[in-house]
Amino acid sequence: MHFSVRLSLFLTLASSLPLVSAVPQHEDQAYTFSSSGRSAATDTDPALEVRQETQRTPSAWTRLRDSLVESVWGLPQRSEGCESRPRNRAKTVSRAPATLQARYGEDVVLRFTIKNQEEVKALVEASNILFLDVWGSHDDWVDIRLSRDVIPSLLGLLPPSLQTSHVPLIRDLAQTIYESYPKAGSASPSQQGPTTRRFSPSASTSKSKPHETKNIFFQDYQPLSVLLPWMRLLVSMFSSHTTLISVGTTAEGRDIPALRVGVHPTNNAQQAPRRRTIVISGGTHAREWISVSTVSYIAYSFITGYGKSKSITKLLEQFDYVFIPTVNPDGYAYTFSTDRLWRKNRQQTSLSFCPGIDLDHSWGYEWDGNATRSNPCSESYAGDQPFEAVEAREIASWARNEVTVNNVHFVAFVDLHSYSQQILYPYGHSCAHLPANLENLEELGAGLAKAIRKSSRENYDVKAACRGIVASCTGDKDADEPATSSALESTAGSALDWFFHDLDVRFSYQIKLRDRGSYGFLLPREHIVPTGKEIYRAMVAMGKFLVSPHVLEEDIDGLRASEEPQDYDNDLEDGEDDKDEQGSTVFRAQADDLQS
């Protein structure tokens, strides 16, 4: 077609189209709260408005115009072997579905800055009166989830200093929750349940660094329907030193699966010595997904590291490791199918509309459920008696049986939680009761924190558990006994204290994982591998300490660059990475088959 004819057609088309003018958006408004009413201004995100604009269906004129332009002018040919420059398009964002909007649409998470014990006490009392969900706390802050409509009531119960000392941590809880679900398949409760969830590499897998794509399992949070086959696959591939066991049965009848990893003498004539065992658990609170992924990461690293990493091989010859990815399978499954922020188990209580018991408050040592006995709706409900929670009772029975029947000596217990980056040691129920081996607990705790810091530069505080869930104040932080009224939640009846006191596990810790910043329990999937790496490094340091305490410091300081977590199997010695390729390739191929 002659150029003049093309130009005439184009000008004719252009003259018939409506004029559109670009109007700049107003400046972003601040998101503030007032004790006298709802939010003073709704949060306006210009970038979001642009993204929403790009998602609108093009008009008939626009489609006709584009079609004519393409037919008249043609499209530029793409060069062989290289990509054309991508168009400058705004990134589209999928919005949270109606089911999530209905459940969480009016909820936000506020972070309060705490300056003294009086403020702590006032915040605790107000939270109890309004039945608020206290997410977490650290030395000088407390995070609380609540509905926007409740904000005026909360601020009205607080002293003037707290009415202005807060900021929104999560402004759009429904959207943040929606984005936390696995990307592959369906992971949101608005679509299909966890039983039909299939895992596959994320869209960005091909662009990731090589050491970050060795196992697609850790590219996202995995539901129970993927976790269990993955554990079976590990056992089938590494049966020489890995077995799948059950440590109990849940309230809904599910097994509580665990991986036992260790190398035992092959000489049957030789009497087996008492086996030293380390338990690493996660998922006690269902919504703390990062704890499940981290236990799985450590288990995978230990299992695949045997025979290739000198450190791991030595540790597995010295100890058995029992990895329990989720102590609370019922609750964990429920977070994928129904309520992402569910905390307790799914056991029936005296109130049919308030099911669930807090597993970490149901253990027998220093159980004190009086504070929540009359309120099964409380997030910290401990039941009406010790060990009323089925899962806590089952795991305690398994542990006792291991000691009395199977000649097991538990030497360490590590319970992973989130969030706030803290390493906590006994006791949790009271700061007045000091452990007999306090110095050893503090020494190893400091070693774990240092190993993490050397691995990822992340800082984890080391303190007694009784201080870990108490918002510290500007007074004497080393006082022997913090005011009991300042406890943000009950600390009695914890697994940490029970294993330490009743089972005599001398090195018991609760580690609160990432982060301290903006995500709370909704840590993005990009943090799965970094968190796993740093805690894996800490568990290697713990094993070395238990083998020979005096070498811990020099081991951490003397880590060679090749041993830092730059590779996926991050404890490999020089020259050992290549030896892992064949075995890891076979395992990855089997894992790929699992999704089909």
Swiss-Prot record:
Residues 220-546 form the Peptidase M14 domain. Residues 23-184 form a propeptide. GO terms for biological process: cell wall organization; proteolysis. Residues 187-207, 583-596 have a biased composition (Polar residues). Glycans are attached at N370. Residues 1-22 form the signal peptide. InterPro entries: Peptidase_M14. Residues 182-211, 557-596 are annotated as: Disordered. It is found in: Vacuole; Secreted. Substrate binds at H285, A286, R287, E288, R343, D360, H361, S418, Y419. Keywords: Cell wall biogenesis/degradation, Disulfide bond, Glycoprotein, Metal-binding, Secreted, Signal, Vacuole, Zinc. Its cofactor is Zn(2+). Binds 1 zinc ion per subunit. Zn(2+) binds at H285, E288, H417. Residues 564-580 have a biased composition (Acidic residues). Disulfide bonds join C354-C377. GO terms for molecular function: zinc ion binding. SUPFAM superfamilies: Zn-dependent exopeptidases. Its main location: other. One of its GO terms (cellular component) is extracellular region. Inactive carboxypeptidase that may play a role in cell wall organization and biogenesis. Belongs to the peptidase M14 family. This is Inactive metallocarboxypeptidase ECM14. It comes from Arthroderma benhamiae (strain ATCC MYA-4681 / CBS 112371). The gene is ECM14.
